[in-house]
Curated annotation (Swiss-Prot):
GO MF terms held by the record: DNA binding; DNA-directed RNA polymerase activity; ribonucleoside binding
Name of the protein in question: DNA-directed RNA polymerase subunit beta
Top-tier EC class: transferase
NCBIfam families, per database record: PRK00405.1, rpoB
Gene field: rpoB
Organism listed in the record: Vibrio cholerae serotype O1 (strain ATCC 39315 / El Tor Inaba N16961)
UniProt EC number: 2.7.7.6
Cystine crosslinks: none
One GO cellular component term noted in the UniProt record for this chain: DNA-directed RNA polymerase complex
Keyword Acetylation in annotation: no
Pfam families reported for this sequence: RNA_pol_Rpb2_1, RNA_pol_Rpb2_2, RNA_pol_Rpb2_3, RNA_pol_Rpb2_45, RNA_pol_Rpb2_6, RNA_pol_Rpb2_7
HAMAP family reported for this sequence: RNApol_bact_RpoB
Length: 1341
């Protein structure tokens, strides 16, 4: 296979056996595509800003004399780029300008005559922009908008599963959920009447809604029931017979026709009887007159002579009524067909409980329910009902909702219609009744066909629409005020409500979250997170088990493993590796199509609904050479159930083994051997790994490390192929290949690297180049490594030599024993960057000042500040040191006569100000790596600010000049080639100044044209450079837009180096976490026969009960990988010839049954040398999830590395030199240092702040709080009878205010007595009892 330039530097041996059909898609596409859809101009107006504008505009005035129409919109250019926004603390956004047209109609002329048209572009606030990595910069911090999983709009049929009523009767209900608008619920009550609710209010009989639609009782019965006709013939009552309806009934009379008795009285009618009746074609049978009594009439029967009603629709028929009918001359009678089995009398019963009789009374009833207490008028009632479900402004099912609705009730037409109509409501009621009758199934609301994803774009669009609707009201008011002759669109629109709605969404919505930026993986997973919480979603408290559980439709869509532990479990999920959203927002997953029993490489994306119809084989099904299934019976899924299916029945096959799990879970090698609970912890803990000082790739990986590193955007990736022209720590310059050039550009790509920047989690973001000048690179190659990446692969931790054995109790209960060598080699040293800021405000007493002249502070404390009072860059500071000197004016105090005298003598004025300097927090010590000063417009900049400004200008100038020189060089090189082609010699060119080359004239017209073109480009380049520099200069020198009352802000960045120490939390990738208990000297650690000590000792008892065996396999494979690295190292040291090295490498890569084909002979000698050099530390291997290295391969690899096949070595005790009594499992495990550092947690309280009401000490490190002495601790002291200790705890150590101060005084005086008083919380209790109206006083006897 062809390796890219960076890949062949270190080829990972792959143990996977399944061929890769589909590469993992771009990991951030769910965010980027959604936002792209939001801001791109969509001519159809289906989604995005365009859709929002079209749904609100045109806005008409109330009187219809004028309207404001929307024409188009455009987004301007952002003022600052992403980095500048982060530094300045502003939002990265584009201004939105909308072209609107105000049309005024002529009142006097016929309708629609236009009197005046004005068009204008109006500013409508700022729209935050997504960065290329899928984040938003809001007020200078990077945020992510998490996608939401919510119930899809449409209609859902459900039941209460027998929980509502005490009898355990199952009550069915239907709910129509629109995208926006009122919910409509239909439900049965225990008496089997059908009711309707609107927006979950009081229930009404369901027939009311049909009456409100203008239906009469007879029409309603006609819709919901089949009819039975009775006829009077020759004094006998005949019944029309549909034999099928008799099934299961017991005959109450002989069923006979033409003298033949088919069913005797008292017998049950069976299928055989029915077949006979059908065969003989019996259509009418004679029935006794009593049979009709109690049946229900289907329509009104009127006596035509007198005009009186004999029987109304839905009335039970009596013998008397029957006699009246025959007297009035009716020969035929229609009754409703009902039975107890599958034609229940539900609607007929419901009509009986319905008090309304006509449309108006039904509308009034609905009005009373929606607006209780308001007097209903006919117009109000009609317009309310009309606007509830039938007005496009108030109600919208959305495309998705309509699609789901139609597929549920089986409707073909009305595809574009967002509102409901009569047919919809009737069909839903019909389906609900048929489900109650036992036909059809209820829906499963946790099925992913009924839950859809709302991503950034859609949520932003909804917020934007909310803002527009607020504006719409104001515009309507203004349009109706009249006098529009000199009004422009701009005067009508106030952009505040729009920008407020957008700002609120991006700044404080529950789904707009502070990005988790611990490492590249945590960034990627945060952007791929799917939450069921948030506005319009669930709440933690109300979500039950079913919602949180893994559903069969999660397969390949949502990860069953990666979800938080704790109250959010199952509500926050992660997207599976290959999943994507379709146009409706449903999750799809790819499958390989099987055609005529042969698995093809064609891939179809199926949603959860489509997937139900197919039989889908697993990715590890055995295939023949031709691509057919090797086994007769194949393990496959159908409708979510796994089972064995004949190979001819299989329609699809999974594309990859890690299709089921998320990216974080796919990074765990041997995941298939881990218990699910531990795998969950492993996936979650990888996200908390802190980037180490030197990243080290995992020896045992899964092969997708490269995808994560590249897609996360922390590395610098080549946009186009070319040759590296120059590299230094902060930038890489690439000369682009000829074939990838855009005509007329200079063909130079410049990559500026990020150096030592603070992340959201205070870890350090730093990019290091991993290429050398002159190296060829292709598009997509990694040029520079970011945090936690190594040669373009994700590298979250370090490979540590591990032994599984107990060691003097230091690894009791998951503790970890670490060798001192790990600390010496800085294996787990991390850099943390903190931002400390100092704000100078304008106070009532005068402005605060940033200065080095601070009262009552010695020289030593000021030694690290410059003359402006700001710390130097590079200063090493510790807790309590001053970083920025600041003084605040304080109010005039009354002076004693003595002080006045001293003032008069010494002129001491310093006491007017107090010292409010920014100091280093107590527990922190580090190095100042950067200082930034922001000065308000119009405030004079201090010396330091000017210095920083000069430095920034110099940097910018240097950057741009270098860029210009490189581009100029490229352009002049092309000029040179043109001139040489035109007959100039090298010597002649050398004698002319380079700038003058462009002014030469050539005989050849074509070449002359080219030269002139190049000259034009040169001028453009120069002008462009000047413009860029001017813009940059303006940005750097202009004042900053600071909050009101703020004059200056100084931000100081401290870099803190944290070595690993006891109390830090570490973990492997299999959920095996622990805390470091001791750092042991190297000489005391167990060592092997070669004298090599282990780095870490883990407790073997942590494995069996937790069932994460993956870690053991990883350790064995790690040992083999390292052993092979050692052999290669040995060969290099012995300077063996390349042929032997090639042969050995080929042997290694061919080991095992693998899909990977590495042909070492294709690599050049130089490539082989580089490869061997990079493999000396160990051969990196990949064991893909569910397709990992088998035991045989691990053993073969151990043998190839001349190691025991058991993976166990004899170890010797470092203290005594004696061998341990049995061989020990030793190997290499990839260990992570998690962001739970003891430095951030350790804390001790001295006298500190107290809570205001209870006067008890606060809790927590942030508040400098104490430990709570709670109820149970009090019991413990009571049990010991330690009365005085208890008294001390409850009084002077807690909330006895006078006792505390006395105690302090006593200690100072050396008198160690204690006088407890009344605890403040007792007073609080008294006050609370008094607030209940009971007075309690302590009476002194």
């Amino acid at each position: 296979m062809v390796y890219s330039y960076t890949e062949k530097k270190r080829i990972r041996k792959d143990f996977g056996t399944r061929p890769q059909v589909l590469d993992i898609p771009y990991l951030l596409s769910i965010q980027l595509d959604s936002f792209e859809k939001f801001i791109e101009q969509d001519p159809e107006g289906q989604y995005g800003l365009e859709a929002a504008f079209r749904s609100v505009f045109p806005i008409q005035s109330y009187n219809g004399n004028s309207e404001l129409q929307y024409v188009s919109y455009r987004l301007g250019e952002p003022v600052f780029d992403v980095k500048e926004c982060q530094i300045r603390g502003v939002t990265y956004s584009k201004p939105l300008r909308v072209k609107l047209r105000l049309v005024i109609f002529d009142k006097d002329a016929p309708a629609g005559t236009v009197k005046d048209i004005k068009e204008q572009e109006v500013y409508m606030g700022e729209i935050p922009l997504m960065t290329e990595n899928g984040t938003f910069v809001i007020n200078g911090t990077e945020r992510v908008i998490v996608s939401q999983l919510h119930r899809s709009p449409g209609v859902f049929f459900d039941s209460d599963k027998g929980k509502t009523h005490s009898s355990g009767k199952v009550l069915y209900n239907a709910r129509i959920i629109p995208y926006r608008g009122s919910w409509l619920d239909f439900e049965f009550d225990p008496k089997d009447n059908l009711y309707v609710r609107i927006d979950r209010r009081r229930k009404l009989p369901a027939s009311i809604i049909l009456r409100a639609l203008g239906k009469t009782s007879a029409e309603i019965l006609d819709i919901f029931f089949e009819k039975v006709n009775f006829e009077v013939k020759d004094q006998t009552l005949m019944m029309e017979l549909v034999p099928e309806r008799l099934r299961g009934e017991t005959a109450t009379f002989d069923i006979e026709a033409d003298g033949k008795v088919y069913v005797e009285k008292g017998r049950r009618v069976t299928a055989r009887h029915i077949r006979q009746l059908e065969k003989d074609g019996v259509n009418f049978i004679e029935v006794p007159v009593e049979y009709i009594v109690g049946k229900v009439s289907a329509k009104d029967y009127v006596n035509e002579a007198t005009g009186e009603l004999i029987i109304t629709a839905n009335q039970e028929i009596s013998l008397e009524a029957l006699a009246n009918l025959s007297q009035a001359g009716y020969k035929k009678l229609e009754v409703l067909f009902t039975n107890d089995l599958d034609h229940g009398p539900f609607m007929s019963e419901t009509l009986r409980v319905d008090s309304t009789t006509d449309r108006i009374s039904a509308l009034v009833e609905i009005y009373r329910m929606m607006r209780p207490g308001e007097p209903p008028t006919k117009e109000a009632a009609e317009s309310l009902f009309e606007s509830l479900f039938f007005s496009a402004e108030r109600y919208d099912l959305s495309t998705v909702g309509r699609m789901k609705f139609n597929s549920s009730i089986g409707r073909e037409d009305a595809e574009e219609q967002g509102t409901l109509d009569e047919v919809d409501i009737i069909e839903v009621m019909k389906k609900l009744i048929s489900i109650r009758n036992g036909k059809g199934e209820v829906d499963d609301i946790d099925h992913l066909g009924n839950r859809r994803i709302r991503s950034v774009g859609e949520m932003a669009e909804n917020q934007f629409r909310v803002g527009l609707v607020r504006v719409e009201r104001a515009v309507k008011e203004r349009l109706s005020l009249g006098d529009l002759d000199n009004v422009m669109p701009q005067d009508l629109i106030n952009a505040k409500p729009i920008s407020a709605a957008v700002k609120e969404f991006f700044g404080s919505s529950q789904l707009s979250q502070f990005m988790d930026q611990n490492n590249p993986l945590s960034e990627v997973t945060h952007k791929r997170r799917i939450s069921a919480l948030g506005p319009g979603g669930l709440t933690r408290e109300r979500a039950g088990f079913e919602v949180r559980d893994v559903h069969v439709t999660h397969y390949g869509r949502l990860c069953p493993i990666e979800t938080p532990e704790g109250p959010n479990i199952g509500l926050i999920n992660s997207l599976s590796a290959f999943a994507r959203c379709n146009e409706y927002g449903f999750l799809e997953t790819p499958y390989r199509r099987v055609v005529n029993g042969v698995v093809t490489d064609e891939v179809d994306y199926l949603s959860a609904i489509e997937e139900g119809q197919f039989v889908i084989a697993q990715a590890n099904a055995k295939l023949t050479e031709e691509g057919g299934f090797a086994d007769e019976l194949v393990t496959a899924r159908q409708k979510g159930e796994s089972g064995l299916h004949p190979r001819e029945h299989v329609d699809y096959m999974d594309v990859a083994t890690n299709q089921v799990v998320s990216i974080a879970a796919s990074l765990i090698p041997f995941l298939e051997h881990d218990d699910a609970n531990r795998a969950l912890m492993g996936a979650n803990m990888q996200r908390q790994a802190v980037p180490t000082l030197r990243s080290e790739k995992p020896l045992v990986g899964t092969g997708i490390e490269r995808n994560v590193a590249v897609d996360s955007g922390v590395t610098a990736v080549a946009k186009r192929g070319g040759v590296i022209q120059s590299v230094d720590a902060s930038r890489i310059v690439v000369k682009v290949n000829e074939e990838e050039l855009i005509p007329g550009e200079a063909g130079i790509d410049i990559y500026n690297l990020t150096k030592y920047t603070r992340s959201n989690q205070n870890t350090c973001i730093n990019q290091r180049p991993c290429v050398m000048p002159g190296e060829p690179v292709a598009r997509g190659d990694v040029l520079a490594d970011g945090p936690s990446t190594d040669l373009g692969e994700l590298a979250l931790g370090q490979n540590m030599r591990i032994a599984f054995m107990p060691w003097n109790g230091y690894n009791f209960e998951d503790s970890i024993l670490v060798s001192e060598r790990v600390v010496q080699d800085d294996r787990f040293t991390t850099i943390h960057i903190q931002e400390l800021s100092c704000v100078a405000r304008d106070t009532k007493l005068g402005a605060e000042e940033i200065t080095a002249d601070i009262p009552n502070v010695g020289e030593a404390a000021l030694s690290k500040l410059d003359e402006s009072g700001i710390v130097y860059i590079g200063a090493e500071v510790k807790g309590g040191d001053i970083l920025v000197g600041k003084v605040t004016p304080k109010g005039e105090t009354q002076l004693t006569p003595e002080e006045k005298l001293l003032r008069a003598i010494f002129g001491e004025k310093a006491s007017d100000v107090k010292d409010t300097s920014l100091r280093v927090p107590n527990s922190v010590a580090g190095t100042v790596i950067d200082v930034q000063v922001f000065t308000r417009d119009g405030v004079e900049k201090d010396k330091r600010a000017l210095e920083i400004e000069q430095m920034q200008l110099k940097e910018a100038k240097k950057d741009l000049t270098e860029e210009f020189q490189i581009l100029e060089g490229g352009l002049l090189a092309r000029v040179r080639s043109v001139l040489l082609a035109g007959g100039y010699t090298e010597a002649k060119l050398g004698s002319i100044e380079r700038k003058k080359w462009l002014e030469q004239t050539l005989e050849n017209e074509e070449l002359q044209n080219q030269l002139e073109q190049l000259a034009e480009q040169y001028d453009e380049l120069k002008a462009d450079f000047d413009k860029k520099f001017e813009a940059k200069r303006r940005k750097i020198t202009q004042g900053d837009d600071l909050a009101p009352g703020v004059l200056k802000i100084v931000k100081v960045y401290l870099a803190v180096k944290r070595r690993i120490q006891p109390g830090d939390k570490m973990a492997g990738r299999h959920g095996n976490k622990g805390v470091i208990s001791k750092i042991n000297p190297v000489e005391d650690m167990p060592y092997d026969e070669n004298g090599q000590p282990v780095d870490i000792v883990l407790n073997p008892l942590g494995v069996p009960s937790r069932m994460n065996i993956g870690q053991i396999l990883e350790v064995h494979l790690g040992l083999a990988a390292k052993g092979i690295g050692d052999k290669i190292n040995q060969m290099i040291k012995e300077q063996q010839e390349l042929a032997k090295l090639r042969e050995f490498l080929q042997k290694v890569y061919d080991l095992g049954d693998t899909r990977q084909r590495v042909d070492i002979s294709e690599l050049s000698d130089e490539d082989v040398r580089t490869l061997a050099h990079n493999l000396r530390a160990g051969l990196p291997v990949a064991t893909p999830v569910f397709d990992g290295a088998p035991e045989s391969s691990i053993k073969a690899m151990l043998e190839l590395a001349d190691l025991p096949a058991s993976g166990q070595l004899t170890l010797f005790d470092g203290r005594t030199g004696d061998a341990f009594e049995r061989p020990v499992t030793v190997g290499y495990m990839y260990m992570l240092k998690l962001n739970h550092l003891v430095d951030d947690k350790m804390h001790a309280r001295s006298t500190g702040s107290y809570s205001l009401v209870t006067q008890q000490p606060l809790g927590g490190k942030a508040q400098f709080g104490g430990q709570r002495f709670g109820e149970m601790e009090v019991w413990a002291l009571e049990a010991y009878g330690a009365a005085y200790t208890l008294q001390e705890m409850l009084t002077v150590k807690s909330d006895d205010v006078n006792g505390r101060t006395k105690m302090y005084k006593n200690i100072v005086d050396g008198n160690h007595a204690m006088e407890p008083g009344m605890p403040e919380s007792f007073n609080v209790l008294l006050k609370e009892i008094r607030s209940l109206g009971i007075n309690i006083e302590l009476e002194d006897e």
